[in-house]
Design a protein with these regions (language model features):
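Acyltransferase
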Residues: 66-70, 110-138, 179, 183-185, ...
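Active-site rim elements
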Residues: 14-18, 107-112, 242-246
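Charged, often glycine-rich, active-site loop that binds/positions anionic groups
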Residues: 144-172, 282-284
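Glycine-rich, small-residue loops and helix-cap segments
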Residues: 12, 28, 154, 177, ...
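Short connector loops at secondary-structure junctions
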Residues: 129-151, 231-234
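Phosphate/diphosphate-binding loops
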Residues: 124, 165, 173-178
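Structural helix-boundary/capping segments
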Residues: 1-103, 121, 126-128, 133, ...
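A solvent-exposed, charged loop/short amphipathic helix patch at secondary-structure junctions
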Residues: 92-113, 228-233, 287-293
């Protein structure tokens, strides 16, 4: 819904603009300004591509985001919410596939910290007290993306998206996106990726432990060479893209939207992360083992959420009682359910004990 034009692309099919704000009220005010139609499509791949039709922002946004705050008091009443068992240590099949995942720790069992579970249980009580029904569910959109259990496919083996497309997307399309951004930006000091030494992109810090991104196809250090070897190539010249993009849309429709309809769910929620990695995980092997676990290395949902165009809103759930780190609750919905999710997130923020979920950082002096 928010134009990505002007943002440095990472993976054009996955990139989104994500506003961060102190409160839902602040966020809604920001959205009233930045959610707008953008006539210029260069720099926003999804609006530039011709194969999947997207609505205009003005067709799916409310007249006023700020007005949603007035609905917070009753937003959760009668709502049916699913909590995936895989994120609350309640799914014995998660992570039991012989070779789970699509790279890194994806597909492995998620071990959610006890203090995160405490915050979730408190949040669940508040949701139910506000009139929501919360049920524990499977989560096929992640299981069928990551192959986390026996019999589950991955995004590459499902048959809706080809392996050839997935490689084209993460290598050719991404390198093209970087190059197009630099050319559009027109910085006289650097206007082409071809002028960059790939070895200087994301260099490994001296003394740091090896990263654990094993299994992924991309090496961003090779992007400059791709640009040098493919002058003048655009995304229209990549034959796998049309079917690949349609396959991503169909995957979301089958594994999330039809599944939500089947369970009569208005939304899905889960803790934003399973744990927080130790600060020394770059140099301490034991800490790295903790920090690179599924659910900890990046947020719960991994690549699935952004790759399939699934909207989410995350709001504070409180501090972990043992380590004092904040934890969020992520609300998930169908494509273009953004407004409904914002309404639910505002409703969640409005309930619970005062100061329970959002507290000033203890090391930060008061203003």
């Amino acid at each position: 819904m928010i134009s990505t034009r002007g943002n440095w692309p990472l993976v054009p099919t996955m990139d989104v603009v994500v506003p961060h704000a102190r409160t839902m009220a602040d966020l809604l005010e920001v959205l009233d300004v930045i959610v707008a139609d953008d006539a210029e499509t260069r720099g926003d791949f999804w609006r530039a591509q011709p194969w999947v039709t997207l609505p205009l922002s003005s067709e799916v946004r409310p007249e006023s985001y700020d007005a949603l705050a007035a609905e917070a008091a009753t937003a959760l009443r009668g709502i049916r919410i699913g909590i995936p068992r895989m994120y609350i240590n309640a799914d014995p099949d998660a992570g039991t596939a012989a070779e789970p995942g699509i790279g890194g720790p994806t597909g492995q069992r998620i071990e959610t910290r006890a203090s995160v579970i405490e915050r979730w249980e408190s949040a669940r009580r508040d949701l139910e007290s506000a009139g929501a029904t919360v049920i524990e569910v499977d989560f096929p959109v992640v299981s069928n993306y990551e192959g986390d259990r026996p019999g589950a496919p991955t995004i590459a083996t499902r048959g809706l998206v080809s392996p050839e497309y997935l490689r084209r997307e993460i290598v050719d399309l991404s390198a093209w996106g970087w190059e197009d951004f630099l050319q559009a930006n027109g910085d006289p000091g650097l206007h082409t990726l071809a002028a960059v030494d790939g070895a200087t992109i994301f260099p490994h810090p001296e003394g740091a432990l090896p990263d654990r991104y094993t299994g992924f196809d991309d090496d961003i250090a090779e992007y400059p060479e791709w640009v040098r070897a493919n002058p003048g190539i655009g995304f229209q010249d990549m034959p796998e893209l049309a079917d690949g993009l349609r396959g991503l849309e169909e995957t979301r429709r089958l594994d999330l939207e039809e599944w939500m309809d089947e369970h009569e769910l208005d939304a899905v929620v889960f803790p934003a992360v399973a744990d927080v990695g130790p600060a020394d995980m770059d140099v301490n092997e034991a800490s790295a083992d903790l920090g690179w676990r599924n659910g900890t290395w990046i947020a719960n949902g991994n690549l699935t959420v952004r790759h399939l165009g699934i909207p989410t809103v995350t709001v504070p759930m409180g501090l972990m009682s043992d380590i004092g780190m904040p934890i969020g609750l992520t609300f998930v919905g169908r494509a273009y359910d953004d407004t409904a999710l914002l309404r639910l997130a505002a409703g969640f923020e409005a309930i619970g004990a005062p100061g329970e979920r959002r507290t000033p950082p203890p090391r930060t002096p008061a203003l």
